[in-house]
């Protein structure tokens, strides 16, 4: 039996992978796990690997396609994954109850094993219970933190939830000027004592409120923990990670020597996207219209 408090199954699944549903990843190593005990996750994953997942989804009708290790349905639509899962539930004759919220999960005091699951409509006896509530990241899809209450009721110690795999909001009012830009770059996250907490590299997206993209997602949890501690982490963005600082300086000087009367805005054109270069100049208090000869 599945108890679902929303009016349909899979609302959160439909939002995964930007609506494409990457259902597993071929790159599964201990260092991919971001918690303190990598063995905890690693041992569990050995019982059902990425290859097992790909094979199982193929059996229920989902042809997989590989994008840099991310496994998507070949149709590139999360809806086909949801429909395949729903069809499998029907084949297995699994009873599904919609719009029925679980209120509590408790040990069955009348039996040596089993559980009593109480909902807003009824109660059920079960030998096994899988709590698949999600965290608190997407309340609109039903993840409102219920699972934490169920876990605490069984005596589990809870770690204060923090945001993860998310964009980072930056201070300042310049971000609207760079909104929409994507670059191949590297982000470094430091704590307020200038200690490096995390770094990652890949496609970075500039948005109106800050910075986003997979590299930012990967370091965001460390920023969230620092903010929970009332500390002030900061980001360093390398927008040209394939080039050294010395090489970039030489390029700027060479361009200035070639045409000292050109503006700074024109000087850095071709090195960076226009909007990003202008933001960098303004943050450094350099007038984009000033002449390049000033840097010689």
Language-model features, listed with the residues they occupy:
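Glycine-rich active-site loop/strand segments that organize a redox cofactor
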Residues: 18-68
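Feature captures the FAD/FMN-dependent oxidoreductase FAD-binding
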Residues: 47-128
């Amino acid at each position: 039996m599945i108890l679902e408090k929303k009016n349909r199954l899979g609302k959160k699944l439909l939002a995964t992978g930007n609506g494409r549903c990457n259902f597993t990843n071929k790159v599964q190593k201990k260092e991919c796990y971001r918690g303190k005990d990598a063995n905890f996750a690693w041992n569990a994953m050995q019982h059902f690997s990425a290859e097992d997942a790909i094979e199982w989804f193929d059996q229920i009708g989902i042809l997989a396609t590989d994008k840099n290790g991310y496994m998507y349905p070949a149709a590139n639509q999360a809806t086909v994954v949801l429909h395949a899962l729903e069809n499998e539930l029907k084949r297995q004759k699994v009873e599904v109850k919609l719009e029925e919220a679980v209120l509590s999960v408790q040990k069955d005091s009348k039996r040596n094993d089993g559980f009593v699951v109480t909902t807003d409509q009824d109660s059920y006896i079960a030998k096994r219970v899988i709590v698949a509530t999600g965290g608190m990241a997407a309340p609109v899809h039903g993840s409102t933190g219920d699972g934490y209450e169920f876990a605490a009721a069984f005596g589990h110690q809870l770690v204060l939830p923090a945001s993860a795999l998310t964009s980072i909001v930056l201070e300042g009012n310049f971000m609207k000027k760079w909104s929409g830009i994507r670059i191949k770059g590297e982000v470094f996250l430091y704590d307020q004592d200038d200690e490096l907490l995390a770094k990652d590299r890949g496609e970075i997206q500039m948005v109106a409120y800050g910075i986003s993209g997979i590299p930012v997602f990967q370091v965001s949890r460390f920023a969230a923990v620092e903010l929970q501690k009332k500390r002030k982490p900061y980001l360093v963005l390398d927008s040209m990670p394939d080039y050294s600082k010395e090489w970039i300086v030489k390029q700027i000087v060479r361009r200035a020597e070639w045409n000292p009367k050109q503006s700074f805005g024109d000087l850095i054109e071709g090195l960076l996207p226009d909007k990003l270069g202008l933001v960098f100049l303004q943050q450094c208090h350099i007038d984009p219209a000033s002449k390049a000869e000033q840097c010689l």
